[in-house]
């Protein structure tokens, strides 16, 4: 992935992130025309997530945050929320 200008357009993408102990719903900022897979491969050690809802693995809400960082090495699954068939994931 090439280095992008700070002036380049980004889009908020709602994602679901699963770690060993947490389920996180929130937004990440992707540059236009960049796939989520490419973003994750090229990302720094932490992924910025906005408007985050953090739940335990059983679905119990732990907290909400306007911003948090997720350590990339702890991500087991990440998927755009609009690709989930189950409407409860959105």
For the regions a language model picked out, list residue spans one by one:
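Conserved RNA-binding domains used in RNP assembly and mRNA/RNA metabolism
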Residues: 1-90
């Amino acid at each position: 992935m090439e280095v992008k200008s700070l002036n380049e357009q980004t889009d908020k993408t709602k994602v679901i992130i699963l770690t060993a102990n947490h389920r996180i719903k929130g937004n990440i900022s992707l540059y236009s025309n960049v796939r989520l897979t490419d973003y994750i491969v090229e990302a720094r050690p932490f992924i910025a997530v906005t408007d985050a809802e953090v739940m335990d693995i059983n679905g119990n809400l732990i907290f909400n945050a306007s911003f948090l960082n997720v350590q990339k090495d702890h991500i087991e699954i990440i998927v755009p929320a609009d690709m989930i068939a189950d409407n409860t994931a959105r």
